[in-house]
Amino acid sequence: MPIPDVIPILLATGNSDKQQAFRSLLNGLSFNPVTPAEIGVSASTTEDGATHEAIAIEKALAWSDAGSTLAIASDGGLVIPSLGSAWQSRHTRRFSGPDVNDSQRVDDLVELMEPFSGEERNASWAEALAIAYKGRLIASWELLGATGEIARTRPSGPIPEFWVFTIWNFPQLGKSYNQLTPEELLSLNDHWTRLSRLVRRFFQSIFVPPLD
């Protein structure tokens, strides 16, 4: 069903990089993306769900309820099979502890992977996305993206908020994930490319705009 008017949708994160990722997902659709800061809302979540999808749903429900609006939220993490139980993708950002900066997280993961070689260094990205309206879930997805490998050394220069993407390499392209062009991301059929298709299909074919 076509969306008749521009509808506000809350980007349920304070992370500017993720806000930009959400904007790219919604680009061309009849929505007005707004940030929590722009509408003056906040929400608290535990983020202790058993899956990325459960965590994304928790975020979407909390933020959509806090803002009394439509909200889109996500949760993701790096899947590193060789580390087994020593690594949980859900704790990618927090694996070094709560008070560690992104630069130290890069160093810690590089050190953790030092004993591994070849395919043992392979890693994929799991990403979940959820959409809710005023505390009610209306859609959610979780998928596993392309496979790259963990770099042996940290990159030079400042580390962005999505720190792990600076050491998640794609040797066939000679780049880390954060250096890939839109065309290269498309060629990899990466997680955001696939989520974009799902989101667009949902909003263009399934979504019924709220009446209140």
Feature-to-residue mapping (PLM):
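Anionic-ligand binding patches
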Residues: P2-L10, D17-D212
